[in-house]
Structures are given as structure tokens and as C-alpha cells.
Amino acid sequence: MTRLPGEQGAAGGPGGAAAGAGGPQGRAQAGEVLGFPVRAVARARVLVAGDVMLDRYWFGEVDRISPEAPVPVVRVARREDRLGGAANVARNVAALGAQATLVGIVGDDEPGRHVAELAREAGIRAELAVDAGRPTTLKMRVLGRQQQLLRVDFEETPGEPALDALDVLSDRLIASHDVLVLSDYAKGALKRVEALIERARRAGVPVLVDPKGDDYRRYRGAALVTPNRSEMQQAVGRWSDEGQLAERAQRLRGELGLEALLVTRSEQGMTLFTDAGRDHVDAQAHEVFDVSGAGDTVLATLAVTRAAGLAWPEAMRWANRAGGIVVGKLGTSIVTAGEMS
């Protein structure tokens, strides 16, 4: 981890062991997986920057209502932590067989050290700035009978020194990667996103963005932006038909100078807009169990396939397949190259 000037922290713990450590794991597969470009993906170097989180799950049984208030009582039987936000994007990049590097901000706390430890275990090179003035962003979910009953969020906006440290890390790493992925969850790590995109452009590294908010001007100069249906409506308003969507999408793409704009549309599939026009694929999910983290998987798949040299339409088809797989899993999950067959 990168510790901010003047900070004291626990060295040698799980977080310290992960600093700058790790490398791609599980990339020694021979041949291709029924068309998935395993060899090319193994050479892909993907840098993920953005809002790093820890997703914490408490699983238990519900067999009574509390006498104190009309709420269920969960008898917790198991706890599980998973990488979330930008860290989940990096986890998916590594699971697909590419070389994943993660830059972000964590707190000087147990969740932050666990993020670093989980990243190392996943084969991710984690370069994390430590901000002792804020907690690591943590989303805690309580589940009973495989259903989510409650979510509790712990989060604060990072300070300027932490953002300065993030800039230093990004500057050092961008040029040695094939693609930069920006995972924006509006938690503050990408407050200076315009400058980050400009640095990547100067280095000749394409930028893929999972956006937040309704002002997409801050993403001007990226190669690809991937809003979901709701986010696209925030940005351009509701559309009455496919023709109106295409008109507004192409106008937005032109205003931002994007190579491509991909709208993910849940059960309606995905629609890609480029200079060549409109391309669409239908959704592939057979059963939707949990959509949390699905956008992370889609973004990671787009990044590794694009870095491997695939054209946008083909990258979209692989991303659609990955998204259809991951929504059938509980919680923030990954898709591997083997599952893409």
C-alpha cells in the first residue's frame, strides 16, 4: 500500500503483504476455450482504477420475529468477505486470465487490509493508497434463506492527500498497461477523472468507463462508456423507441468523442453504438438470481477482450455471455474463462 505522508500504520499485516504483490494466476491454460481468446487475454495488461470496496455478507437463518420491533431475527451462521466496486472489476479481470492491476483508496482499518489480502489471493497487483482519515468503503449485507434482508453502508469521501497519492500511483502505472478501466461508484476516488483520462490519452492507453451521475462530460475522451438503462435515461432522458435511443446515443457519443457507447439493458440485452451504427445482442441469462456486481463483470470482460485485440461488437458478445452467467450467482461474483465456453 501507499501510505500518506506522516501516517503510522500496521506494517506486515495482511494488507502489507499485498502491497504491490501478486501477479496473474491461473493463466497457463493451453489453447482456447471454445473461441474465448485465452492466449491473447493472458497477455492483456489491464489497469483498474476507481472506488474500491469490501462487500461483507452475513448468512443466517430466520425463524422468528424480534419482540423489540417487527423485524426478523437472523441467527448468523457464516460470514464472507468479497472484493467490491473497482476491486471486483479487477477480480473479474484476473479470473478471466488477464494481468490485473488495481489502484484505489482504502482506510487504515481491518476492511482495508482485507481488501489487500483478498486482492493478493486473487492474483491482483494491488497498489492502494491508505487514507487514515476515512474508513474503507464497506457494504454489509445480511441474508436469510438466501434473500437479502438488509444492507448497511460505511463510506466517506477521500481527502485531497489521498487523491494526490492516487494520482501518483496512476501516473506511474498507466503507460505499462494496454487498457485503463475506470469504475465509478460516486464514492470520490474518481473526483479528478478528467485529468486521469487525459493522462491515459497522452500515453496512448484507451479508457473504458462504468459511469455514474448525469453529467457525462467528465468522461470526455474515453474510448467506451457503459451506462445501464437507468443511467442512460439519467444522461439523455427517456426514449420512446429504438430510433430515438439510437439518435440520442450517437449524439452523446459524438459530444464525448467516444469510440463506442454500450448500453446494458438487463432483460433486453445490450446495445452498442459506434461509427458503424447500432449493434445489439439479446440477454443470455436463463435465471436471474442476483444482479449485484454484474456491471463489474461486463466491464472486465470488455476490457480483457478489447485488450486482446477483439473488435467492439465481438467484445460486447463475450461481455453479454459473462453477464448472463454472473447474474445466476449469489452476491458479487466472478466469471472464469472456463465458464465462457
Placement of each model-derived feature along the sequence:
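Conserved phosphate/ATP/ADP-binding segment of small-molecule kinases
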Residues: 187-278
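Conserved post-catalytic alpha-helical subdomain immediately downstream of the catalytic base
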Residues: 259-260, 284-341
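Substrate-binding N-lobe of the ribokinase-like
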Residues: 30-38, 44-45, 67, 71-138
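Conserved phosphate-binding/catalytic loop of the ribokinase/pfkB sugar-kinase fold
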Residues: 128-134, 139-176
